């Protein structure tokens, strides 16, 4: 029972499916002048933060009957475990091919921001489409899949709200589900002896890694230099815990140069959050989360939405292993690595480019000369088989 139509999509009563979401996108696409009060003649219904995030579009696969794209938050986690307990490659499945065709239909209708696919374009589309409302030449976007704290930052746009995911038949059961579990990435948790010419260099490397697990080192990695923190003051998070508190300068400068995205500001301007193994603290993220961001967290936590977890548990359905996360990085032996590099070309970056060529050109039928688009799933699968998919999968299995 809805008091107004918008409740189908907004708030705790939201219960829309992917077809209804696409229908809403069509409404957004068709009414730019009305929606922007005459400021623009185009509103892009869906976009990714930047072109290097374009594989976030594939996360819509969950809402097309639960098709698996990634079994963790990383794009390299292109694996799932089937009902027999066997590791399988997600990008080569018929379900994924169908999803690419669905996305191509959306692209042909102008529902996806056209610059999202070009990896040479380094623009931050989120800043452009959500952060220019008050500029002389504003640009507008409607919806994206991204992290809540930075996406709801007040300095980016004060009108952004979090919504529940589409209801979908996931693992054979209708449910709310977000298949984007935060994975532990083991590639940042080791030191290669081969990279150290002497024992002294190895010991210094080990000391650096150890340092990040001391109180001082952890604070440095998560929050930055002491000068960035208030002396003798702490921040109380919504979990009741005390965390180091940033100075006003940090928050104000972050809003000015990074659109309120503190994670990006810390990494790109202040030099912390270095991708070397350390225990990440959520306290920095709490401090730049807006009131709408916290409302979004509360909405999701109080809903019946299910999430990917390390326990791999979820509503029972077709595949007992559906909810199990698969790491984005495997600790392969030298022999396994050699087998992959010598017998397959599955690791080439042009693989995802070929997939997005389907999105760009399949429905429109306008592929440039030299770009071949598979006519059906058999041709799509043949491209993987030509790269020796079987040997690649066997090495990981």
Model-predicted regions and their roles:
Residues 1-57, 78-124, 191-204, 210-222, ...:
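Helix-loop-helix "hinge/cap" segment bordering the ligand-binding cleft or interdomain interface
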Residues 4-7, 69-94, 169-180, 234-268, ...:
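Short, solvent-exposed loop/beta-turn-alpha elements that line the ligand-binding surface or hinge
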Residues 5-14, 86-90, 335-344, 359-369:
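Second-shell loop/turn segments in exported
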Residues 129-148:
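Alpha-to-beta junction loops
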Residues 151-177:
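Ligand-binding "clamshell"
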Residues 182-188:
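Short, solvent-exposed loop/turn segments at the edges of secondary structure
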Residues 211, 215-360:
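Conserved small-residue motifs centered on glycine
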Residues 352-397:
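Histidine-centered catalytic/metal-binding microenvironments
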């Amino acid at each position: 029972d809805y008091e107004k139509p918008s409740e189908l999509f907004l708030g705790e009563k939201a219960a829309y499916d992917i077809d209804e979401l696409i229908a809403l996108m069509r409404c957004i696409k068709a009414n730019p002048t009305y929606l922007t009060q005459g400021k623009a003649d185009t509103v892009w219904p869906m976009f990714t933060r930047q072109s290097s995030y374009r594989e976030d579009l594939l996360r819509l696969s969950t809402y097309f009957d639960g098709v698996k794209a990634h079994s963790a938050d990383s794009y390299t986690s292109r694996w799932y475990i089937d009902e027999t307990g066997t590791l399988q490659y997600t990008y080569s499945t018929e379900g994924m091919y169908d999803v690419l065709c669905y996305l191509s239909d959306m692209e042909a209708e102008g529902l996806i921001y056209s610059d999202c696919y070009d990896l040479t374009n380094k623009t931050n589309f989120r800043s452009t489409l959500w952060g220019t409302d008050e500029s002389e030449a504003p640009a507008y976007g409607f919806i994206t899949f991204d992290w809540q704290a930075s996406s709801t930052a007040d300095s980016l746009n004060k009108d952004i709200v979090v919504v529940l995911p589409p209801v979908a038949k996931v693992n054979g059961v209708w449910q709310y589900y977000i298949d984007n579990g935060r994975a532990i990435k083991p590639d940042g948790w080791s030191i290669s002896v081969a990279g150290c010419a002497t024992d002294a260099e190895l010991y210094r490397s080990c000391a650096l890694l150890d340092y990040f697990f001391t109180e001082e080192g952890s604070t440095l990695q998560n929050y930055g230099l002491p000068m960035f923190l208030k002396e003798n003051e702490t921040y109380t998070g919504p979990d009741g815990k005390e965390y180091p508190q940033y100075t006003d300068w940090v928050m104000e400068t972050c809003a000015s140069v990074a659109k309120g995205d503190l994670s990006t500001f810390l990494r790109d301007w202040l030099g912390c959050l270095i991708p070397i193994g350390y225990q990440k603290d959520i306290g920095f993220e709490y401090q730049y989360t807006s009131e709408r961001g916290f409302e979004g967290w509360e909405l999701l936590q109080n809903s019946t939405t299910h999430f990917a977890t390390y326990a791999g548990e979820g509503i029972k359905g077709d595949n007992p292993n559906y909810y199990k996360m698969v790491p984005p990085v495997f600790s392969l032996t030298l022999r396994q690595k050699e087998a992959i590099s010598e017998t397959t070309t599955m690791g080439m970056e042009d693989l995802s480019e070929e997939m997005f060529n389907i999105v760009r050109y399949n429905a429109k039928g306008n592929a440039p000369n030299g770009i071949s688009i598979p006519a059906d799933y058999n041709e799509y699968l043949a491209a993987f088989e030509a790269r020796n998919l079987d040997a690649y999968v066997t090495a990981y299995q």
